[in-house]
Design a protein with these regions (language model features):
Chain B
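Terminal, compositionally biased segments used for targeting/anchoring and flexible tails
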Residues: 2-216
Length: 118, 216, 89
């Protein structure tokens, strides 16, 4: 059975692969926040799970190999939100610089709203 | 609730009062930087508030394979409920009080002669709203590639060796449905109540890569 | 008589939910699922028209020939009707 040309990388059914490694990991807080953001923003109609998948697919196989699940998800959610006009890249870039300046760790940079001054 | 991966647990995680995990103290990654900034912008613009995000995390944390296990146990003991699961597994889940949202659930039953197994070859679709998060291996290349072509070989890697007179049915979640396997009720369980039966039902048995456990 | 169908062979380069390992294969409709928004439109911020969705059952021998572990094992997938052609016996 020869492979039809045009199979996209994510379309994995029937491809050769190694053994299943029964690994699992506990979810980090930031990962849960990514997941929750996806659920809430898609429920608000800003994008669909189909759009999320489309961007993940278009990201290509290298991204699948080098980035974790939630790293790819935050990239995809961002692209969908940019396409939806939820915020601009300039706004995001500016805020990312501010966040980065709050400290060194995730905990320091993700300070609760009451503690933040901008 | 037994766990298939002995090193950790998703269940019993309390969203409040949980101690900071190691990742809270790790250097901020680019992606974490994005996540914080995006969440703040969306909150300030009223698109997705912190409260909504936190409520959704609480909802996610409250879901676990234990919910699916309770559904399986009731399926085993209650013939009328069994018919309702067969007719509409989503409605039957809601009847048990599970907040499954828009989940469109189909329950596929294992018997003496049929063994079902679930996959999403195209991404990682999973009945999250009933069972919680899928395991990492479910989302990875090896499982997604091989289980639709050589399911028996994959099941053997999980320690499940099926005889030739058992038919294997693989279900690829390609669209809007989500699937739960109802594992076969183990022998020697006639005297167990629903709670004790639910304790035998593992996450992996509801994906189809394991059987339910036998009573101790 | 359960409807026998063949999955379309086309390979368009974009977001579709018909796995390539099923394209051109013959199966039988296991059940009708109703109508759902077309993911091929929803993925691109387009209004998604409702399309008929079916669960289609394939034998492993149909999919993999001699490579099938057990020819009578089956594979079920949800396929939108616009990907299915009638394949009378």
């Amino acid at each position: 059975m020869s492979e039809p040309p045009g199979r996209r990388w994510h379309d994995m059914g029937g491809q050769s692969a190694g053994s299943v490694v029964p690994q699992d990991h506990d979810f980090a807080l930031w990962e849960k926040r990514v997941d929750a953001l996806m659920v809430v923003a898609s429920a608000k109609g800003l994008f669909t799970v189909d759009g999320l998948r489309r961007v993940l697919e278009d990201m290509g196989e290298a991204a699948f190999e080098t980035h974790s699940y939630y790293e790819r998800w935050i990239l995809s959610i961002n692209q969908n939100l940019i396409e939806a006009g939820a915020y601009t890249l300039a706004e995001l870039g500016t805020r990312m610089t501010v966040v980065r300046g709050r400290g060194e760790t995730y905990g320091e940079c993700a300070r609760p709203a009451g503690d933040r001054d901008g | 609730m037994p766990h298939d991966a002995p090193e950790h647990s998703h269940t019993g995680i309390s969203p409040s009062g949980h101690p900071y995990r190691a990742d809270q103290d790790a250097p901020l990654s680019y992606f974490q930087n994005m996540e914080i900034a995006m969440r703040e912008l969306l909150s300030e613009k009223g698109i997705a508030t912190e409260a909504e995000i936190n409520a959704e995390i609480d909802r996610m944390d409250s879901r676990s394979p234990a919910d699916g296990a309770r559904l399986v146990a009731r399926f085993w003991v209650d013939p009328a409920f069994r018919e309702r699961v067969r007719a509409d597994a989503s409605a039957a889940s809601r009847e048990m009080g599970f907040d499954i949202g828009a989940l469109r659930l189909i329950a596929v039953e294992n018997t003496e002669n049929v063994h079902n197994v679930i996959v999403c070859t195209l991404c990682s679709c999973y009945p999250r709203n009933l069972l919680g998060f899928p395991p990492d291996w479910y989302k990875q290349r090896a499982y997604r590639s091989r289980v639709v072509k050589t399911p028996r070989s994959v099941l053997r890697e999980f320690g499940l060796d099926l005889p030739g007179d058992v038919q294997v049915r693989v279900h690829d979640s390609t669209a809007d449905m989500r699937y739960i396997v109802i594992p076969a009720r183990p022998t020697g369980t006639a005297d167990l109540n629903e709670t004790a039966l639910a304790a035998l039902v593992t996450r992996d048995s509801m994906i189809g890569v394991a059987r339910a456990q036998s009573p101790a | 008589m359960v409807e026998r169908v063949r999955v379309a062979r086309m390979m368009p380069p974009g977001h579709v939910r018909t796995p390539s390992y099923l394209r051109g294969r013959i199966g039988r409709i296991e059940r009708d699922l109703g109508h759902f928004g077309n993911p091929e439109q929803a993925a691109y911020h387009l209004e998604a028209s409702k399309k008929r969705l079916c669960r289609v059952r394939f034998s492993m021998s149909e999919l993999w020939g001699d490579a099938a572990e057990n020819p009578s094992d089956t594979l079920d997938a949800e396929i939108f009707a616009h990907w299915l052609e009638s394949a009378p016996d």
